[in-house]
Amino acid sequence: MTTIEIPAYAKINLYLAVTDKLPNGYHTVETVMQAISLHDTVTVEIPQNAVEPITLTCSAPYVPCDETNLVWRAAERFFEAAEAQNTDFRRFPVRMHIEKNIPVAGGLAGGSTDAAAALIALNRLAHDILDTDALLAIAAKLGADVPFCVLANLGHPTALGLHWGEQMTVLPSLPALHVVVAASGEGCPTPWAYGRIDALPHDPENGYIPMVDALTIGDPDAVFSRMYNIFEAAIFPERPLAKQCHDILSRHADRALLSGSGSAVIGLFTDPTRAEIACAALRAEGAAAHLCRTL
């Protein structure tokens, strides 16, 4: 096998609290993450007569295709880990392509899930030289969302993330729901978003435990009532289009919530017709709306 194509699933946050700011400036979090069917596609192949060891292309012209891209960095870290694991391992040239569908800078882990898919594809091309724990260790060095995306792209769509979000515990899957993702296009750079919440109270009463309990019993209504995102209080006053998307979704969805640090907003629905109506309402206001489902 010389070519592998992997779906790279988007991430939403069912629960997201910031618990502390460390002396080094990083924040610790408690978050429950869920994969949805909206996805990019990452293709990795071993080309014949390759000139460069790594080549990266992307369908979106605004995505850099060099060493700054997380997919490129994932490939470099994978080869380093494979060589450390087995001294007989020899690097092979790779050509990688990202077909983008996930809105960028929306709190949906688009770059992280592409990197996770690349790690999985490279490992399969290398005959599974690394186990899942080794892949997760690489992922944790690439970014806080990458370990969850590895788990999700391997078939574990719901997980609890602690510390910086990289300490993962697989949770019972969310009951099947319809999802509308609304992208206002305003963008929320992560450092800016975290700077906005430093003055806010960081930990809601009881923390993430009620959400884990709701998932364990498999009750959608209990999940809806326990959804929380600290960033809403900080982001919506600064991103009016995201707030407008939230207002529209709230009129139709069982629950609407900001995803990650924004600016994408998601709505969860038990009724597919209501999800379609919400999509149409968002598009009528000029927002990009994606109809998908939980995994």
Residue ranges and their predicted role:
Residues 1-106, 124-133, 154, 174, ...:
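ATP-binding N-lobe of GHMP and related small-molecule kinases
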Residues 16, 40-44, 145-150, 159, ...:
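Short beta-strand scaffold segments in enzyme catalytic cores
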Residues 50-64, 118, 140, 219-228:
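Short, basic/glycine-rich phosphate-binding loops at helix/coil junctions
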Residues 74-85, 134, 138-141, 244-252, ...:
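Generic non-transmembrane alpha-helical segments
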Residues 97-126, 144, 255-269:
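Glycine/serine-rich anion-binding loops at beta->alpha junctions
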Residues 115, 119-163:
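Contiguous, small/hydrophobic- and glycine-enriched helical/loop subdomains that border
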Residues 151-255, 270-273, 279-280, 285-295:
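Conserved, helical-rich catalytic subdomain that frames metal- and/or nucleotide-binding sites
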